[in-house]
Amino acid sequence: MQDHKQRFLFPDSDIRGELVQLESSISRIIEGQNYPLPVQGLIGEAVAAVALLASTLKFKGRLALQAQGKGPVSLLLAECSHDGELRALARHSDGQDWSHGDIQTLIGEGTMVITITPDQGRQYQGIVPLSGDTLAQCLQGYFQQSEQLPTRLWLASGNNRAAGLLLQRLPNQLSTTDGNTQMWEHLEALASTLQMEELLNLDDQTILRRLFHDTPPQLPDAQPLRFGCTCSRERNRNALISLGNQELQQLLEEDGEVTLTCDFCRHQEHFDAVDLAEMLRESR
């Protein structure tokens, strides 16, 4: 299965949908990280979620979901770019009982931040409390508070796979309020019959045909999705320079070298004494 996102539209109504199915990018995100299984599941749901939400981007940029709380998972971060590059990470404590995988147990009391960062222009942030029992419920609260658009999400993750379904009612343009309300209630009821095992294991065409066989949606071309990281030697170099003269001098004198590891992709960049001395000169 190639990782992809499939948009679907219902003729003569102001309702749209997105279906995301991921495998290789999830495997790449979690490999070598030693995440407990419930944390892997939470990461998978978050990655599927940002892939769905990034469909709202009308410009070049990135969308990020960040959740922080007082539970054993102190940080959950997932990002998707306008062209379908995905990455994610989680920070968690050790020695925990990982038998429960709901968001309230894993992250606990906290907040979720959705950040939209255009390549050009001003950044936008929406902040909501982690008040739902699932990540999907928390995101539905975000849409209700920040976007004020009726939105339903279904997220599933397991066995190095993740998938998501989004259904959203847009402002009236193609139909009347009554017509859109009736169609929304009908489609929402149909989508609610979806089982998480079906979302994870069936192909998108089969899922959409089973759910909406009486109102077949239009299917534009699917968008491929893939793992991708924005780390680079230049960014790591700039991060070291930003430490300032004193810390750079200390690194040079005590260690003579430094290796930085990207938290997302585990790529390492090594800087030797010559590199550090050059950075020290630049920072003065």
Curated annotation (Swiss-Prot):
One of its GO terms (biological process) is protein refolding. One of its GO terms (molecular function) is unfolded protein binding. Under oxidizing conditions two disulfide bonds are formed involving the reactive cysteines. Under reducing conditions zinc is bound to the reactive cysteines and the protein is inactive. It comes from the Bacteria. This is 33 kDa chaperonin. PANTHER family: 33 KDA CHAPERONIN (PTHR30111:SF1). It is found in: Cytoplasm. Keywords: Chaperone, Cytoplasm, Disulfide bond, Redox-active center, Zinc. InterPro entries: Heat_shock_Hsp33, Heat_shock_Hsp33_C, Heat_shock_Hsp33_N, Hsp33_helix_hairpin_bin_dom_sf. One of its GO terms (cellular component) is cytoplasm. Its main location: cytoplasm. Disulfide bonds join 229-231, 262-265. SUPFAM superfamilies: Hsp33 domain (SSF64397), HSP33 redox switch-like (SSF118352). Redox regulated molecular chaperone. Protects both thermally unfolding and oxidatively damaged proteins from irreversible aggregation. Plays an important role in the bacterial defense system toward oxidative stress. Belongs to the HSP33 family.
